[in-house]
């Protein structure tokens, strides 16, 4: 029972972290690339 109760929470947390981290890294990367190209 404990594994079934912890598994969904861990999955949701994993998806939330990656869902927020991936766009943030892409956004910062694109901004740094724009500034690097402008210079």
Curated annotation (Swiss-Prot):
The family database entries (Pfam families) matched by this protein are listed as: Cytochrom_B559 (PF00283)
List the record's Gene Ontology CC terms alphabetically.
chloroplast thylakoid membrane; photosystem II reaction center
Membrane protein topology class: Single-pass membrane protein
Sorted keywords for this record are: Chloroplast, Electron transport, Heme, Iron, Membrane, Metal-binding, Photosynthesis, Photosystem II, Plastid, Thylakoid, Transmembrane, Transmembrane helix, Transport
Q: Where in the cell is it found?
A: Plastid, Chloroplast thylakoid membrane
Q: In which broad location class does this protein mainly occur, judging by the first location in its UniProt entry? A: plastid
List GO molecular-function terms, semicolon-separated: electron transfer activity; heme binding; iron ion binding
Required cofactor(s): heme b
Oligomeric form and interacting partners? Heterodimer of an alpha subunit and a beta subunit. PSII is composed of 1 copy each of membrane proteins PsbA, PsbB, PsbC, PsbD, PsbE, PsbF, PsbH, PsbI, PsbJ, PsbK, PsbL, PsbM, PsbT, PsbX, PsbY, PsbZ, Psb30/Ycf12, at least 3 peripheral proteins of the oxygen-evolving complex and a large number of cofactors. It forms dimeric complexes.
Q: What does this protein do?
A: This b-type cytochrome is tightly associated with the reaction center of photosystem II (PSII). PSII is a light-driven water:plastoquinone oxidoreductase that uses light energy to abstract electrons from H(2)O, generating O(2) and a proton gradient subsequently used for ATP formation. It consists of a core antenna complex that captures photons, and an electron transfer chain that converts photonic excitation into a charge separation.
Q: Which family does it belong to?
A: Belongs to the PsbE/PsbF family.
Q: What is this protein called?
A: Cytochrome b559 subunit beta
Q: Which organism is it from?
A: Gnetum gnemon
């Amino acid at each position: 029972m404990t594994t079934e109760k912890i598994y969904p929470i861990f999955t949701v947390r994993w998806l939330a972290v990656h869902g927020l981290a991936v766009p943030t890294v892409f956004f910062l990367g694109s901004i740094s690339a724009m500034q690097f190209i402008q210079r």
